[in-house]
Amino acid sequence: MDYKETLLMPKTDFPMRGGLPNKEPQIQEKWDAEDQYHKALEKNKGNETFILHDGPPYANGNLHMGHALNKILKDFIVRYKTMQGFYAPYVPGWDTHGLPIEQALTKKGVDRKKMSTAEFREKCKEFALEQIELQKKDFRRLGVRGDFNDPYITLKPEYEAAQIRIFGEMADKGLIYKGKKPVYWSPSSESSLAEAEIEYHDKRSASIYVAFDVKDDKGVVDADAKFIIWTTTPWTIPSNVAITVHPELKYGQYNVNGEKYIIAEALSDAVAEALDWDKASIELEKEYTGKELEYVVAQHPFLDRESLVINGDHVTTDAGTGCVHTAPGHGEDDYIVGQKYELPVISPIDDKGVFTEEGGQFEGMFYDKANKAVTDLLTEKGALLKLDFITHSYPHDWRTKKPVIFRATPQWFASISKVRQDILDAIENTNFKVNWGKTRIYNMVRDRGEWVISRQRVWGVPLPVFYAENGEIIMTKETVNHVADLFAEHGSNIWFEREAKDLLPEGFTHPGSPNGTFTKETDIMDVWFDSGSSHRGVLETRPELSFPADMYLEGSDQYRGWFNSSITTSVATRGVSPYKFLLSHGFVMDGEGKKMSKSLGNVIVPDQVVKQKGADIARLWVSSTDYLADVRISDEILKQTSDVYRKIRNTLRFMLGNINDFNPDTDSIPESELLEVDRYLLNRLREFTASTINNYENFDYLNIYQEVQNFLNVELSNFYLDYGKDILYIEQRDSHIRRSMQTVLYQILVDMTKLLAPILVHTAEEVWSHTPHVKEESVHLADMPKVVEVDQALLDKWRTFMNLRDDVNRALETARNEKVIGKSLEAKVTIASNDKFNASEFLTSFDALHQLFIVSQVKVVDKLDDQATAYEHGDIVIEHADGEKCERCWNYSEDLGAVDELTHLCPRCQQVVKSLV
């Protein structure tokens, strides 16, 4: 008889190699065919709900790793909540309006000048819907589960109607108004931008110091004195109407070689250095407070215009001269302080950034090119004291990457000032995973200006505003709701297809239009108003969802974006935050922490990861990141992730192979009758389960990633499964010792598969399909393991044993190196107490020590002679085992015997083989 035939070797069809790129789509097809998304909802119908509201990605372009990070994190959460019994619908969404789609069509050769606005918008819509289908396919390929057959899309008529109603309610409360104010203006996009559409890059700019002569000294300063201003935007000097000083700062009149200059005293040294003044020739003649300088009149350096000295609290001594060049048409602080003094708002720049006729001799010049012309003129007039160039952080258009300017134009605004405190209060009542998240959005709301909600484009939701013949604005509850009803029925394109009178309620009249003629607003809404209306357009509209959402989760850039616009519109109309809990993640960088770019050749995209390695590798990578900060990805990092995956897969496969002949309904051993080592592992499983559930609850996936590896590698592979081979393969099939271990092994396999399911969605499903006797058709329709109290005394006892076992392994390794033994089964271990640990007493309660240490013989004595090696948990001696090697189990025994014709079997193997012969 071949002894191998008598061994109970592992058997499973679960393959060693994952083959994920080919296998995952098959698993997904099965899920789709079974409509698993709705099955999971049906299972938990009537239970407590959990609503994670999806922030809509922009419907343009291929997915990047940031998209993958975001959607996979959301999927972890929703799948976990579902397995915890929550009714957790997930409705993905898309943001579809805005400039990038207009630009994409232009790149494709669509000439908008050859078609009507309505026709061009139709093409934009078609393009957006095509992009959604492509992105949808890629999101699903990542294993993300949701209602992809019925997502929310910001261009859908019912969504646009909800957005218009929010606008109307805000208008009713006096929160929407029109004004000429300086706003971020992008000449490259020919449109105003919100703060969320601004990003900062380094820019080289002119740095100039300019002298303004005093025209009317008001009896305060010397008539021949000059104010010095500093600016990095020479092109705004033609729009100067004032010089702002801080009322509480000290200012000095300095005589420098006969010239009298007024600057802040705190900046005098810095100015002297910048202007190369000889400090020995500088004399402080007079001192004033900024308040005393108020209403002194200076003369514009080259225009026939006065420049009034005014007070403003925004003036600092961080840089410059303490005398701030003020052009209300080109700066927010300038505008605000200018309103107080009723200063004119001059902004002689057109949509393209070119000087208009109002710009006089600069007419026709691009603003940036005008910098040189202005400095040349200042030099000619003797007003330019210094020209230099500096590189500084400057606002750019987030789409075109070109610099932006502040420009006063007629715009529509949503008032932040009127609801700011309410929003801040709502933030205080919102939960955050990390305090800095709360601080970040709180400070952004606290410090932000009014929200420019108008855009001078065509692909977006129109502002539902009409104008009477006399120019009066018509924006009533009646007219706005009528437009909302029209949009709900026909979509917003109707605004561009019908005349104004046909968009107003039937029979509508207005005293400002005696002839019954009306015009309509041509601007559209900021796309952040679109996505920021999703709490109404989605949460309050879809029957399976509810308001407010339990959670919003997006990239950290959304503190100024979607998080901000959503809470603004929600607080303004509903009085509460649209989210109860806010969580954010960082950006995806390359392996060295650098930004990914095609030029650096360091770009990794989801499609590439999925095709080469599989979605489960991408998902495992997400779980391995500290996602609250920026995360890293590279081929090397993905290789490490794949290695971890392989270990997880092989451990699960080993367990599957060893429970192939086990039926939990008939073969399970009651817990009270389990071997103590098995009870220890059962309690370790419970401990691991409690920790994993806690980590899921706290969104700590990195902890799960690390603890899974620790449990699988240290507890299972390095100990329990290694120890178990001598039992699972060698003992009789139905023996108590084998069934005891299989009982626990089965529990570990089932619970581990469930705990891994939200992360390794495909692999967990594959394991489940190979696990015998499971009740649910899919692991994703099963419940998470329950948290059970652990036997702490048992855990403490066995932790001490595991430490002692580590000492034995160290001793075995030394003996191996000294050629005393080869494999550990060739060893006889003698353990004794020492000064550090009473090993002999401790080990009295342990059975089958030779199996636990994976050696042939173990002897425990009170004391050993000086030849023993002292370890932390006892003195240990390793010798070669006594007797001969059993040809079946490879343990050494002095009692080898025969069964019929079979020789060289230890007593245990003799007994097992007898039962088979």
From Swiss-Prot:
It holds the Pfam family zf-FPG_IleRS. This is Isoleucine--tRNA ligase. It catalyses: tRNA(Ile) + L-isoleucine + ATP = L-isoleucyl-tRNA(Ile) + AMP + diphosphate. PROSITE patterns: AA_TRNA_LIGASE_I. HAMAP family: Ile_tRNA_synth_type1. GO terms for molecular function: aminoacyl-tRNA deacylase activity; ATP binding; isoleucine-tRNA ligase activity; tRNA binding; zinc ion binding. Keywords: Aminoacyl-tRNA synthetase, ATP-binding, Cytoplasm, Ligase, Metal-binding, Nucleotide-binding, Protein biosynthesis, Zinc. NCBIfam families: ileS (TIGR00392). Catalyzes the attachment of isoleucine to tRNA(Ile). As IleRS can inadvertently accommodate and process structurally similar amino acids such as valine, to avoid such errors it has two additional distinct tRNA(Ile)-dependent editing activities. One activity is designated as 'pretransfer' editing and involves the hydrolysis of activated Val-AMP. The other activity is designated 'posttransfer' editing and involves deacylation of mischarged Val-tRNA(Ile). Its cofactor is Zn(2+). It is an enzyme of class 6 (ligase). Binds 1 zinc ion per subunit. IleRS has two distinct active sites: one for aminoacylation and one for editing. The misactivated valine is translocated from the active site to the editing site, which sterically excludes the correctly activated isoleucine. The single editing site contains two valyl binding pockets, one specific for each substrate (Val-AMP or Val-tRNA(Ile)). It is found in: Cytoplasm.
